[in-house]
Amino acid sequence: MDPNCSCSTGGSCTCTSSCACKNCKCTSCKKSCCSCCPVGCSKCAQGCVCKGAADKCTCCA
């Protein structure tokens, strides 16, 4: 998949472990596709890479 991961809202991303997602709005994260990582997010604990502020997170909620 494109490393920029421009998936649609509500979709799922399947980026590599060294994902450089910049526009990911997916509801189902796989590996490093979270847009951000709020404290206590179990999915982020599994390897998501923070890309933005926690208060804007929609991927790991």
UniProtKB/Swiss-Prot annotation:
Q: Which GO terms describe its biological process?
A: cellular response to chromate; cellular response to zinc ion; detoxification of copper ion; intracellular monoatomic cation homeostasis; intracellular zinc ion homeostasis; negative regulation of growth; negative regulation of neuron apoptotic process; nitric oxide mediated signal transduction
Tell me which family the UniProt entry assigns to this protein.
Belongs to the metallothionein superfamily. Type 1 family.
Q: Which residues carry this modification: N-acetylmethionine?
A: M1
**InterPro entries in the record, alphabetically?**
Metalthion_dom_sf, Metalthion_dom_sf_vert, Metalthion_vert, Metalthion_vert_metal_BS
| Record-linked PANTHER family | METALLOTHIONEIN (PTHR23299), METALLOTHIONEIN-1F (PTHR23299:SF55)
Positions contributing to a divalent metal cation 1 binding:
C5, C7, C21, C24
| Signal peptide as annotated in the record | none
Q: List ligand-binding residues for a divalent metal cation 6.
A: C37, C41, C44, C60
Keyword Glycosyltransferase listed? The answer is no
Write out the entry's keywords from A to Z: Acetylation, Metal-binding, Metal-thiolate cluster
Q: What does this protein do?
A: Metallothioneins have a high content of cysteine residues that bind various heavy metals; these proteins are transcriptionally regulated by both heavy metals and glucocorticoids.
> What is the species listed in this Swiss-Prot or TrEMBL entry?
Mus musculus (Mouse)
Q: What protein am I looking at?
A: Metallothionein-1
Which of this chain's residues are annotated to bind a divalent metal cation 3?
A: C15, C19, C24, C29
Q: Which parts of the sequence are annotated with region: Alpha?
A: 30-61
Q: Which PROSITE patterns match?
A: METALLOTHIONEIN_VRT
One family from Pfam that matches here is Metallothio
Q: Identify the residues that bind a divalent metal cation 5.
A: C34, C36, C37, C50
Matching entries from Gene3D superfamilies are given as: Metallothionein Isoform II
Residue sites binding a divalent metal cation 2 per the record: C7, C13, C15, C26
Question: Where on this chain does a divalent metal cation 7 bind?
Answer: C50, C57, C59, C60
Domain annotation text?
A: Class I metallothioneins contain 2 metal-binding domains: four divalent ions are chelated within cluster A of the alpha domain and are coordinated via cysteinyl thiolate bridges to 11 cysteine ligands. Cluster B, the corresponding region within the beta domain, can ligate three divalent ions to 9 cysteines.
Which Gene Ontology molecular-function terms are recorded? copper ion binding; metal ion binding; zinc ion binding
Superkingdom field: Eukaryota
Any single GO CC term annotated in Swiss-Prot or TrEMBL for this entry: cytosol
**Residues annotated for a divalent metal cation 4 binding in this entry:** C33, C34, C44, C48
